[in-house]
Amino acid sequence: SRAVADSWMDEVIKLCGRELVRAQIAICGMSTWSKRSLSQEDAPQTPRPVAEIVPSFINKDTETIIIMLEFIANLPPELKAALSERQPSLPEPQQYVPALKDSNLSFEEFKKLIRNRQSEAADSNPSELKYLGLDTHSQKKRQPYVALFEKCCLIGCTKRSLANYC
């Protein structure tokens, strides 16, 4: 059965888009099961502690979520509103109109004040993507996947090469 699994994994496929993603999911599911069955043949079945049953990625995801929640809790209110409502982090100039009517500022001074605040906010606040951890680090992590997916689509790749990314 092991030789059949090896020949199946060395089979070359040429898929693109959704079909490639479906194949990746199927291969990852099958390679996980085959790894489990091979390890069960080699080692006797012993009960594992509950902590080992929970996959490590869940613990890492939990840590990441906690860090993000703490970070978001410390954000200025304007940025919290931008993250939750997907609105610009700065108020629109129309919201300043009542304040302008009650003040002695000229319209030109008022426009200058708004521009200064917008440029200060742009300089001091990183983009929304950085707050969510989706900056260049995540893009670099995706680059090998993109290269492999392009190869699988244009030339073809083995199921084993897809299984390496499970």
Swiss-Prot record:
Primary subcellular site in the record, as a coarse category: secreted
Record's subcellular location: Secreted
Keyword Methyltransferase applies: no
Residues of the signal peptide: 1-5
A GO term for molecular function: hormone activity
One GO CC term on file: extracellular region
Gene3D superfamilies, per the entry: Insulin-like
Subunit and partners: Heterodimer of a B chain and an A chain linked by two disulfide bonds.
Protein family: Belongs to the insulin family.
PANTHER family reported in the protein's UniProt record: PRORELAXIN H1, RELAXIN
Name the record gives this protein: Prorelaxin H1
